[in-house]
């Protein structure tokens, strides 16, 4: 649904892929639990290729140098104020396929908790944000837990998986995941991220 206050008869402007991040690795760890909280994992930018002109929108870093896309107020100012967007579909950026599937699930679960508590339930802008619940296709039971936990949140609109996979996504080991997505009424979005495996 379109947020209250939108102009009647106006076609809403929806940004369908807004990348959001935690403020730092330390910030992300605040949403994690042991034994994973103290484990090592890659930084967001470890495997990125530098883009000509820079990776981020100018002025998008937080006031204390936080990652761009980590502050709901700054993102809202750019999207809803400067660009005239009505609804933003948020896609938390993870670390792709991890060698330890349980660590991978813990990282994505932390992103989901951050997404809901910091963005979707934001007192001022939450109504304009929609969320992508990130799940780990390498850990189906962990993925199903995340879907069950968040699928009834009114602002969750899709499930997100990395584009890369160790196996083709049509294979039987993924069927429980797709069936859970159908049962929840949530489409599945793919997004390229760091990691090793088969890329489409």
Language model regions located:
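Helix-coil boundary/capping segments in enzymes
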Residues: 1-200
